[in-house]
C-alpha cells in the first residue's frame, strides 16, 4: 500500500525536486546571464513532462490535506524568455521626440501634420510623415536643375493653384559648402514658390503678402534642415538659428539683402573700371561719384587702396586731364585726395580760360547783330541824300544866277566897285551881301 502510494506521488516528488533545484539555482549568486540555452531547454522539458503526468486531484473535501508534500501549483517554473532582459515596447516615430525637433535633429523624428498646400509631401492620414523624395533628392548643388538661375521670379507669380506642371516639384539640392549658401537660397526660394508658398516670402522691396500657418512653418523648417545641413551653414546663419531654430524667414530676408548687396558690389566695380572724365562735367560731381563707390565697397568688405583707386581714375581721364603733372611725376605715393586736387585745379583753369576768351572776343551772334545794324543805318542816309540833292542843286544855281546877274547889271553901284579895290566894298542888293577885298 505504501509502495503504491509512493509510486503515485513519485512524479510529484520529482517535479518538486526539480522545482526546488531550480529555485536553488536561481537563489545562488551565479549570474543568470551565464545559463546556457541547453540547460534552459532541458529544464523546460522536465517541467512539461511532470505537469503532463500529474493525476487529476479530487476536490479538497474528499482528499485530506497532506502537509508533508509540496503543492503542485507552487512548483510551477516560469517560462524562460527569449533573452536575458525582458522585451520592452518600442516607441514609434510619432512618440519619439514629441517636444519637437532639437537643433538640427533628424527631420524624420519630428511629428509632421499634413501639409495642406502641397499634398505630395503629406500622404493621407492624420499625423503622417513626409513621403520619400524621388531619386534625384540628395544631389549636390552643382547638379544642373530646371529651376537654376541667378534670379528668381516675383512671389506674386506663385499664387496660382497647383497644375499638372508643378504637381511634382523638384526639391532643392543639398548644401555642401558655406560659400554656396546664397546660391542655394536662390534655388530654395524657387522651390517654395513652385510649392505655392511665394506669398509668404519677403522680397527686397516689400514684406511678405501674408503670414504663414503652422503647417507651412513646419514644412519650411523640415525642408530647410533637410537640404541645408548644419555643418555647411555660414556663421551668421548659425547665430540666427541659435536664438530661434524655426526663424527661417529671417534667414531668407537677410539672404535676399545680401544678394542685393552683392549685385551692387558688382555694379560698383564695373563702374569703377569704366570711369570716363574729360572736364565736360564739374569736378565736384566726378569726385562725389568715385568717392561714394569706394565707400560702398569698403563698407561691404572690399577695400581698395589708394594705388589701385588712382589707377582706375587715371585710366578714365582723357583730354588735357590725361597729362596731369602730379600723375606723371609722383604717381607712386599718390593718394585719391591728391589726384582729385589736381583735377580740381585743372578744371578751374579751364573755366577761367573760357571766361577770358569770352571777354576779348565777341561771339558770332554779336557780329551778325552789328552787320545788320550797319546795313539798316546806311540805307536811309543814302535815300535821304538822293531825295534832297535836286533841291540843294537848284537853290545853289538860283543863288549863283542872281549874283552873276547883279554883277553884270549897269549902275552906280557897279562903278564904285570897279574904281576902288582898297576900300571896303559894300553891296547893296536884295540879298544884302558884304564882301571883303581878301575874299573876292
Curated annotation (Swiss-Prot):
Residues 299-401 are annotated as: RNA-binding. InterPro entries: TYA. The keyword Cytoplasm applies. It is found in: Cytoplasm. The keyword Cytoplasm applies. Induction: Ty1-BL is a highly expressed element. Induced under amino acid starvation conditions by GCN4. GO terms for molecular function: RNA binding. Residues 20-31, 46-55, 137-168, 373-411 have a biased composition (Polar residues). Residues 363-372 have a biased composition (Basic and acidic residues). The record marks 401-402 as: Cleavage. GO terms for cellular component: cytoplasm. One of its GO terms (biological process) is viral translational frameshifting. Residues 20-84, 137-173, 350-424 are annotated as: Disordered. Transmembrane segments: none annotated. Keywords: Cytoplasm, RNA-binding, Transposable element. The C-terminal RNA-binding region of CA is sufficient for all its nucleocapsid-like chaperone activities. Capsid protein (CA) is the structural component of the virus-like particle (VLP), forming the shell that encapsulates the retrotransposons dimeric RNA genome. The particles are assembled from trimer-clustered units and there are holes in the capsid shells that allow for the diffusion of macromolecules. CA also has nucleocapsid-like chaperone activity, promoting primer tRNA(i)-Met annealing to the multipartite primer-binding site (PBS), dimerization of Ty1 RNA and initiation of reverse transcription. Retrotransposons are mobile genetic entities that are able to replicate via an RNA intermediate and a reverse transcription step. In contrast to retroviruses, retrotransposons are non-infectious, lack an envelope and remain intracellular. Ty1 retrotransposons belong to the copia elements (pseudoviridae). Homotrimer. This is Transposon Ty1-BL Gag polyprotein. It comes from Saccharomyces cerevisiae (strain ATCC 204508 / S288c).
